[in-house]
Amino acid sequence: MGKQGSPRSPRPETIDKEEKFGRRSLDSLSGNDLLLGRRIYASEVSKAQGSKHDQSSGSSNKFWKKQHSWLRRNFKSIVLMISVTGFIFCMDSIMVSIFHSDSRAVVQDISRLSNMTLHKNGAVDASPVQMYSRLLNLASDSLAKNEFKPDTPNFREERSSKSSQWKPCADNNKAAVALERSRELSNGYIMVSANGGLNQQRVAICNAVAVAALLNATLVLPRFLYSNVWKDPSQFGDIYQEDHFIEYLKDEVNIVKNLPQHLKSTDNKNLSLVTDTELVKEATPVDYIEHVLPLLKKYGMVHLFGYGNRLGFDPLPFDVQRLRCKCNFHALKFAPKIQEAGSLLVKRIRRFKTSRSRLEEALLGESMVKSTVKGEEEPLKYLALHLRFEEDMVAYSLCDFGGGEAERKELQAYREDHFPLLLKRLKKSKPVSPEELRKTGKCPLTPEEATLVLAGLGFKRKTYIYLAGSQIYGGSSRMLPLTRLYPNIATKETLLTPQELAPFKNFSSQLAALDFIACIASDVFAMTDSGSQLSSLVSGFRNYYGNGQAPTLRPNKKRLAAILSDSETIKWKIFEDRVRKMVEEGQKLRTRPYGRSIYRQPRCPECMCKF
């Protein structure tokens, strides 16, 4: 149809219905056709008689007799035809009415389903919460305009060419000479019970290796404490390769699978117990020498219970620091079943092709997909996004996420159930407003904010995204901004069959290992919380093995909050420029600053060699 007022769509004139049909019949029919299949109006007869004044009245009577005779002969057929036509018309009207009714119902059902999701407890989500509707509309328009434009490099490699000058070398055995220990000189055994999830436990393992070397002790293969949060009974051998771990570090640290029988008495364990409250966070070597070594020598063992991030990064002897890197990047290999599932996961993301990068080789070993693929088509490139927007994190932040009074009540109830110490501490301190928390970068990014960052960086709608993370607070309604702008989203649950996931069911740490693999192997890794342990370890692996071609996108939450504070007025082009500058600043090549995590930033002489 044309636009209103155009020549193609003239406004119809009102005409008399009878006059219209009469004129059309007279103009279009001629001769005896006037008599067929329709009733003759008196006005037409009068006109016909006037126009044919040369005909006699006898002829007129004859004409009427023929007409009446024809009507009598065909009366039943005419009635039948009218009845059938009427019946068809009625049925058509009924079917159209039913179709439209069903269509409206389906549309309404889809709308309700898109605006609601079920929590595990059966409660229904409210309508989708959008804090930046205007920017989302601008982002959608921008994605539509750029969809068919040529692809750009688009943050698919690190900004500095000097990043490729750093090469992995923590496994250099020549440096291990200084840490060689004989079994006769061991000061005793160190037992470790690590807390937390997969990533916290990984850090605890490598810290324990460093402490064992520092105190000249024999390390008993670490145990993992059962957590009411993670609810995973997995132990070391369920997640990592025990024999490889022991063999790889044998020249620097003595590691055994079990404590000797003569040291297993309950009294001995209790007397030598050191809890995490007795060691300060990021303790120094002096702390261990003064508080742990005496117990080790006295009882022949020490039990570090609830162990985690209890060893600082500086000051620390060069070789002990290097040993941490060797543990994290070389000695800890995932168990074969995790490697195989991780290999299958990456294989399906890349559409049965493999990039065969050193990253994938380090992660997957012999399980890496080695199948050759005909043709010159490259493996599918993908972005891995780690969303940290779980209910516990959201509640603990004390921030406002646009859900109004219902959201505030829900999060307060969660805090009362899970964080009583937080509430107790808040009563004794000066309150900080949610607005101030957001302004200072203390609030976790929502899926909506993550979507705007990706769009601002120029990632196209067709971008393939692997989504890592736990249950998102708000469910699918919170995810709508992301899923609407970037529909090509996959998770381990959508890429692997229920049968393939079955061995990992109820083992959250093993499932997290699959996310760990998919994130490290990705072409681009984007995080929403730089403080997360998974993001820290993943970015460290990518720095160590990536050869400058494994970029990590790390938004500065404080700067992003300042950008989004202008959401109602800012132009999209300006928004893009500011977001790009923010991310580029975080991608600048840096060697590890003093005191910073060697797991996140391994570019330093202790872990890597510069050529």
Curated annotation (Swiss-Prot):
Swiss-Prot/TrEMBL GO biological process terms: fucose metabolic process
Listed name of the protein: O-fucosyltransferase 8
Species in which this protein is naturally found: Arabidopsis thaliana
Name of the coding gene: OFUT8
Membrane topology of this protein: Single-pass type II membrane protein
GO CC annotation: membrane
Gene Ontology terms for molecular function: glycosyltransferase activity
Family of the protein in this entry: Belongs to the glycosyltransferase GT106 family.
Subcellular location, record wording: Membrane
Region (Disordered): 1-29
Composition-biased stretches (Basic and acidic residues): 10-26
UniProt superkingdom: Eukaryota
UniProt pathway: Glycan metabolism
Keywords from the named record: Carbohydrate metabolism, Fucose metabolism, Glycoprotein, Glycosyltransferase, Membrane, Signal-anchor, Transferase, Transmembrane, Transmembrane helix
InterPro entries, per database record: FucosylTrfase_pln (IPR024709), GDP-Fuc_O-FucTrfase (IPR019378), GT106_glycosyltransferase (IPR052272)
Transmembrane residue ranges: 78-98
Primary enzyme class: transferase
Glycosylation sites: N115, N216, N270, N506
Residues the record lists as binding substrate: H386, L387, R388
Enzyme Commission number(s) from the entry: 2.4.1.-
